[in-house]
Amino acid sequence: PAIAEESVAAGHIPEISGARFWLIDPLDGTKEFIKKNGDFTVNIGLVEDHTPIAGAVYRPVSDTLWIGADGVGAWRIDGDGETALAVRTADTDQGLTVIASASHRSPELEAYIDNLPKVARSISRGSSLKFCLIADGEADVYPRLSPTMEWDTAAGHAVVAAAGGRVETPDGAPLLYK
C-alpha cells in the first residue's frame, strides 16, 4: 500500500497490514513552492519493518534526483550525470555545517544549534533538500525539533542512510515508521 499526504488529508488512509509500504509526498515544501524559491521536492520512500529502505527525492526546479537504497548506495543525478554520495565525517575542530528548515525555525531550534560543539555555518533550506545536502556531504547536522510527518522524511531518510548517515530521534534512537 501507499500513503500520500494528499490522500490522508482527503480522509483516505489505507490499511497497512504488511511490513512494507510506500510513503509519498508529491509536493514537499508547500511554503517554498508558494514563495517560488525552488526549495520544494517530490518524495517517494519505501519502508520495510519500520525503516526506510529506498528513497527518491526529486527537485523539479533544478531537474535533480537524489536516490538511495539500503545495501546499494546513494546517488545524485543531474545535468552533470550521476554522482555517488557519501556523508562527510563531521570535523568539530573546523566547525559543523548545520542545515535547518527555512519555514520552521524556533527559539528551541536556535538554542539547540547554539549548544552544538562548534558551528561554522548555518544554512536554511526547505523540504527534503536538507536530507539531500547531508547525503551530498555539504552539511553535517539537520536538527528537526518541531513536528513533521512520515511522508516528509522517509525518502530523504533512505537517501541519507544509503549514503552512510543516520537519522535519529532527539534522544538518539533510530527514527522508526509505524
Predicted regions and their residues:
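Structural motif
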Residues: 1, 20-22, 54-55, 97, ...
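Oxyanion/phosphate-interacting regions
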Residues: 110-116, 131-178
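Short gly/ser/thr-rich secondary-structure transition/capping motifs
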Residues: 2-7, 81, 172-173
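Acidic beta-strand-loop-alpha-helix segment within the catalytic core
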Residues: 44-132
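Flexible, acidic active-site loops/lids enriched in D/E/S/T/G that coordinate Mg2+ and/or position polar
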Residues: 1-49, 56
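Residue-level structural signal for beta-strand termini and adjacent loop
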Residues: 8, 37, 58, 71, ...
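Conserved beta-strand termini and adjacent loop/short-helix elements that scaffold enzyme active sites
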Residues: 5, 101, 124-125, 144, ...
